[in-house]
Amino acid sequence: MLFCIFAKSSHTPANCPARQQKHTFMIIKRILSTAFAIAATVVSLAGVPPVSHPKIGTTAQSDDGAITITLVAKKQNYGGSADTRDADINSPKSINIHPDGSKYYVNSLEGCTTISYDFKTNRKLAVIHHQFREGRDDALWSQPSGLYPWRHYHNNVNTFAGKPVESTFSHNGRYLWVPYYRRSFDINAQDPSAVAVIDTRSDKVVRLMETGPLPKMVSTSPDGKTVAISHWGNNTVGLIDISSGKPEEWHHKMVLTVDRQLDLNYPLNRSVDRDNGSGYALRGTVFTPDNRYLIVGCMGGGGGIAVIDIQQQKYLGRVLGMMSNVRHLVISNGYLYLSINGGGVVQRMPLKDFMAVARTMDGTTRKTATARNWENCNVGKGARTISISPDGRYIFAACNNVSQVYVVDTKTMKAVCHIGVDSYPVGLDISSDGRYVFVTSQGRSNHGGNAVNIYEVTYKNPPSARFCPACGAPRTDEMKKCPECGLQYEGMTVMNGNITPDKTPDGTQDAKNTAIKPIYYAGGALAAVLAGVFFFVRSRRRK
């Protein structure tokens, strides 16, 4: 390329200094433009780690042999064989195993679908399309609450396709709540979105309710009376009363603001980056076991964890002191666990210690407090969803940047093994017996993704112990309440870190340190080009 650029200069008349100087300048400009274009392209690729596609049968084991994890099945929308290929897996964002272990649900963000599968056979049971039309689907909608005003769009707002993000079960697993990242026409997610409620008996949408802009995380309270939805888009959290068993009687309770609500006024004809720069970027959301508080991770802004007093219907403030970029929250065995996306870390603190700090805030005169003495465990960069074995012994973390699932021993807070997963993992869930872990790989920048990996987990000592989710005291089936803290057990169980009402019964590529290499190559290429410019100019001056 450079040879061709230099060659074009040979026809410049030698007896015209002005033209020669101008021509030299144009050549240098062309060289520099080309160099920077090459460098920019290479650097942009540096943000996309290498793609990984582990083969079925891939296995990892802890050094002491206490836990072994094996990739046993896949659902993938690329290559593969007839029994693994699935065209409905389109940017799978999250996965949720039904509390009774009969089926599991995958949210395909870009496919605008939720797919249900038989847990034992992996047979597809239904494809639930999130596409709605005003007039035809009016009966699905709850009454407008007045809490979510429309500011930019006003016509046919109930005709859209919804992009499903996360999910939570309610009413003993009868219903699955699925918020939409945005309505398809709202290109910058600045007006109300919606949440769909799927009846898991029929696998059909039976209710639609409005939400704030860009909802991501959704959680059900331990007593099964409230659903909380955190709005990434504008620093707010919505609460829905679901105390009735009838969907038509569910209604919005209130919207609470974390410090300040963002004023959204983006173009209607040009997309902007809403994944970044969205205030606190509210993400991980979980109720405390006593139903009293809702805690919400702040992935952006000033970071921390927002605390809402459900009883007083009041935002208290943000607890600080943990690492920045909090992504997912789980409460298990008396501990609050966090995944730290950027740092690739799992942190924890006794829940009682965290709440002692949180209760020092009042939402007015004191809106921040610092919690210290966190325990840390390094896992892979890009730690996204975390889930915990039923006995609380092991944490499983989907690590996006390195395309790995990490396993952490909670006794030592050390990573004991990790295993490859299709790039780039985001969602994760574990079966109620701890024997299977399901991971969704969404992909990034049109690389990797479009896969669900299914792992079988074997333990030297299978999970059996159960603990109080509030204080960590041992728990048995006969206990109706915790003898230590008095938490009522009746009507609740702990599954995957979310406390929900009881339900009756192709080769792996190492991604380590490889993402930085294109930057070195880009720098080297740019240096070489600049050196070429220097010697070219020097030779022209000699002439």
Segments and roles (model prediction):
Residues 516-528, 535:
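Short, hydrophobic alpha-helical membrane anchors of single-pass surface/secreted proteins
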Residues 24-35:
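Bacterial N-terminal signal peptides that target proteins for export
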Residues 530-543:
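C-terminal membrane-anchoring or membrane-association module
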